Regions:
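Conserved Rossmann-fold NAD(P)-dependent oxidoreductase catalytic core, especially the SDR/UDP-sugar
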Residues: 65-101
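NAD(P)H-binding glycine-rich loop region in Rossmannoid oxidoreductase-like domains
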Residues: 21-59, 70
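Mid/C-terminal beta-alpha module of Rossmann-like enzyme folds, strongest
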Residues: 157, 161-208
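Substrate-positioning beta->alpha
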Residues: 135-163
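Active-site Tyr-X1-5-Lys
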Residues: 101-129
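Glycine-rich NAD(P)-binding loop of the Rossmann-fold in SDR/ketoreductase-type enzymes
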Residues: 19, 35, 51, 55-66, ...
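Rossmann-fold cofactor-recognition segment
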Residues: 11-22
Length: 227
């Protein structure tokens, strides 16, 4: 697919409420949508998924199931943004076939969304390890590793893989979180050790060989996307 910013439609919950099947169906028909990138949902703060499980279930599981149904009805390709948190977060280097074991309610809610997407074969699940650009946090963790990629690079990759199906990990190089923060920040980031954070995973890093292979097949420079 040839994709550019002019061909994309960015909507809001007012016009496209994922809990309102009828509204979504009318919108998709009116706009003649061929691809739907599902980024709506509930993420931060993580505590909300512990304190308000009804909201977490409604937005991340039921809302996603509604999107699957409306995409199926209209034969629309669905791209679902999931998270690397569905993996156990113990040994790292998780590939798309690694066993899954979410470590918090947010991750369980995203895996619940994945379950409904898996029923629809015209779909692509992206397990993304992403953070905001620029790095917005005042502190970064020592003793924990991951595969952060800034959201601006994820946004560059997604249009290139719209026609893929199945599951794909998206992330950057494996690094200790504090090292990532200091490498890409224009100011020194304070550190906090993993042991001081309750229930934080030790290593959520991703194996991104499949992503690299796709970029190479498209004759793209990996270093333009994976930092």
């Amino acid at each position: 697919m040839n994709f550019n910013s002019e061909s994309a439609i960015f909507t809001s919950s007012k016009d496209f409420n994922i809990l309102d099947f009828s509204q979504m169906n009318k919108y998709l028909i009116k706009k003649k949508i061929k691809y739907l990138i599902h980024v709506a949902g509930l993420s931060r703060p993580m505590s909300i998924h512990e304190n308000n499980i009804s909201k977490s279930i409604n937005l991340n599981i039921i809302g996603t199931a509604n999107i699957v149904k409306v995409c199926k009805k209209n034969n629309i390709k669905l791209i679902y943004i999931s998270t690397n948190y569905v993996y156990p977060g113990v040994k790292g280097n998780y590939n798309e076939n690694s066993p899954l074991k979410p470590f918090n309610n947010y991750a369980w809610s995203k895996l619940g969304g994945e379950a409904s997407v898996q029923l629809y074969k015209n779909s692509l699940i992206l397990r993304v390890c992403m953070t905001d650009f620029p790095f917005t946090h005042k502190k970064a963790i020592t003793g924990a590793k991951t595969s952060f990629m800034f959201n601006k690079y994820v946004a560059k990759i997604i249009p290139l893989i719209l026609d893929e199906k199945g599951i794909l990990n998206i992330g950057g190089k494996k690094r200790e979180i504090i090292n990532f923060a200091n490498k890409f920040s224009n100011k020194r980031i304070a550190s906090i050790h993993l042991n001081k954070i309750k229930n934080y995973p030790k290593d959520t890093s991703l194996n991104i060989n499949k992503l690299k292979k796709l970029l190479i097949e498209k004759k793209l420079n990996i270093s333009d996307y994976i930092k």
